[in-house]
Structure formats: C-alpha cells, structure tokens
Amino acid sequence: MKREVLNMGYRSDVAYVIRFGTVDQRDTFIELVKHRNDEHLKQALDECETNYDLPIITFFTDDVKWYPDYPEVRAHNHLMEWAVELYKEAGYRVVELGEDGEEQENEDGDCDCLDDYIYTRHSLETDFPRVKQEVKNV
C-alpha cells in the first residue's frame, strides 16, 4: 500500500518506527537496502537507528523542512513502504509535528503496538522573571 505523503513544507519534527516480524527479517532488510543502487535510500537508512534487540528500525529528526518532493524525504517514505511490501508481518508508524503544532500521522500494517513508540505531548512552559519579594520590617 502506497503511503500517503504528507505535505508539511515548513519546519517539522518527524519520527517513524518500522517493525518487522523478527530481528532476522529486519537485518535481512538492512542488507537489502545496503546492496541497492540507491544512494538516497542508503543515506535514509544511515540516518536511522537499527541497533536494537527488538525487530525495529527507528528515525527521528527535528526542525527540518520535510518537503515530500525532496529526494531525502522520498527515500525515507520508500524505506517504510518497501519494508511493508517485502514482509507481511512488517508495519510502520510515522508522526510529523509541524512548527504550528499541527500533527499528522500515518501508518501501515498491524501497527497497534507501535503507538507506544511515537506519541506527542503538548505542553505550555514559561520563563517569567522571578517575582520580587517584599521585605517587611518588624
């Protein structure tokens, strides 16, 4: 199934996880990518974390222009899509959070178990100056 490419052209934080049925499947997939004649796909894999005891590949970047027509972004999308095409047990979840707080999610495969890996938390923080304390003379 072709992943819907999300158009978030301004600065975004992006994270995804690809889950395989087994660690062996994940490792075989990594080797397939390394032997492809596609430098963008190899670079996308190099930007991912793969050194897990679990059968997953993860990616996170922040404050990036995530244009869907950029070759680097297309490569990351292809990495997720190809894993699901090759392995019926595979699935992925991707979350993109724009600088305006807009959140977009996409997933493929049986990804209920991937919700714990990527989630957003909205919070309000302040850095007000310290309140001047009155000193009372007794």
Go through each PLM region and give its residues.
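Glycine- and charge-rich intrinsically disordered segments
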Residues: 1-2, 137
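Short, extreme N-terminal segment that most often corresponds to the first beta-strand
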Residues: 2-34
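Charged interaction segments
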Residues: 32-138
